[in-house]
């Protein structure tokens, strides 16, 4: 079984991927729905990171690498963290990661971007 097939089975087992008659916010009809809010455990987060890492690793080998992983707020934040950890653990690649805030803070770290800095020359993977 490929990691893609295993990932689909994992989403179904986790109650994240469901099948039926759904209508999206835009009014489009779809036979399936993905609700990532149904991931709720550390084991699921770890597995999710492993699936993302497998895909990213495969794609980056073909593309010649990357400099940074970016996870857009809000749902991309746990994805980028678990993917970066899994890439290091499973493949020995230690990517910097970064994510954004949707709102600026007036105390502490006031920036909108947190984590590794994004430089002009960086090749960035957006998760």
How does the language model describe each region?
Residues 27, 69, 97:
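Conserved hydrophobic/aromatic pocket- or pore-lining residues that grip, position, or stack substrates
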